[in-house]
A protein has these predicted regions:
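Conserved catalytic/coupling modules of large nucleotide/cofactor-utilizing molecular machines
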Residues: 1-152
Length: 152
């Protein structure tokens, strides 16, 4: 019944995206146990970017400020679009790691911070265009990063 509601009113992809983010958090939990024992530096870059993306998901999506005028209530459609942006960043970062791009270049603090703050910086109405702009910004950043890496 709830799946039908999501399919009809939000997107058929919502539950798949939710499952992907749950898996990300589960893997992050396992990796954090290793990190506590031996430190993050011993992890390969694909696992380190997973930890970074879990931080983005936790801070940018799961943490809620009930006293904030925008964050106290977030429409389900906006939540879905927020998850899409986080997923876009995660997929782009994973592809960059596979191309052997340095983690310090992949983890652009300004871009990651902008994604974390989307729930505050994008209002709860008329948000489609802003999410499209942010997704384009992510795409453009990683495209440029990949092109620069290919030239080196």
């Amino acid at each position: 019944m709830i799946k039908e509601y999501y399919d009809d009113n939000i997107s058929p992809e919502l539950l798949k995206l939710r499952a992907k983010m749950m898996k990300l958090l589960s893997e992050d939990d396992k990796l954090n146990q290793i990190v506590q024992l031996v430190g993050e530096d011993v992890l390969p870059n694909d696992q380190r970017i997973l930890i970074e993306m879990a931080k983005v998901l936790k801070k940018g999506f799961l943490q809620q400020n009930a006293m904030h005028e925008v964050d106290s209530y977030v429409p389900l459609d906006k939540q879905y679009k927020m998850l899409q942006v986080i997923d876009n960043l995660y997929d782009s970062a994973e592809k960059a790691v596979k191309k052997q791009i340095a983690l310090t270049k992949i983890k652009n603090d300004d871009l990651f911070e902008e994604v974390i703050k989307i729930k505050y910086n994008i209002p709860n109405e008329d948000y489609d265009e802003k999410f499209d702009e942010l997704n384009k910004k992510i795409k453009d950043y990683f495209l440029k990063l990949t092109e620069n890496n290919d030239q080196e």
